[in-house]
Amino acid sequence: SPDSRKVASCKIRPTEKRYVYYVESSPADQLQPKLHKQEYAKPGDELPFKVPCIYEVETGRAIIPSTELFNHQYHISRPSWDKDSRTLTFEYNERGHQNYRILEISAEDGTVRPIIEESSDKYVNYSRIYRHHLRDGKRIIWSSERDNWNHLYMYDRATGKPTHQITKGEWYVRDIIRIDEENEFIYFSANGVQTDEDPYHIRYYRIGFDGNGLTDLTPERGTHKAWFSRDMQYLVDV
């Protein structure tokens, strides 16, 4: 933890290894075929179970949370301490990929609560998840395909609810380039904003945290690849 008083770790319950087998029909070093096996978990197989835990450095006391909110896990990832050392956050991807949660563990008593929940009756595209905690500790920028397009939302951490949608429209946010917290701007790439050209052409944009002031930084027609200067005052576009 930032105050060096606690350590976060992960308790793992392993599972029996499962394999698939395949035949190499014409190996280079012999006439007979070879049988090979590869470790591979198939649909329905039990997966390793992970529990993020917190330990006090001085006393060795273990703070082990209830697993109720992350029981059916496909994967647990991105554990990170908050700067005040009071909580640990991590991402929970439910098996089946229809529920995705950002969970917070109290470093005092192990209480777990969701600060963001993403659900779909079809599929949560977890490969496109983006999360950024603002320095004020109160707001989180989050990406979601909940309206069938990938857009950015501002979340209130205390309530776990979105306060507003930052980007919106029938277009797709691709990558976040920079979060400028001082001036409250987001720099990002997107495709499909311009309805009169190829919807897969990528351009670069800037928008305010409040969702206002969308600015096209690469207005020329066509697809773009940009590199920004450190102060975000200049870009090289190819």
Predicted feature locations:
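Residue-level recognition of a conserved intra-blade site in WD40 beta-propeller repeats
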Residues: 81-82, 133-134, 178-181, 228
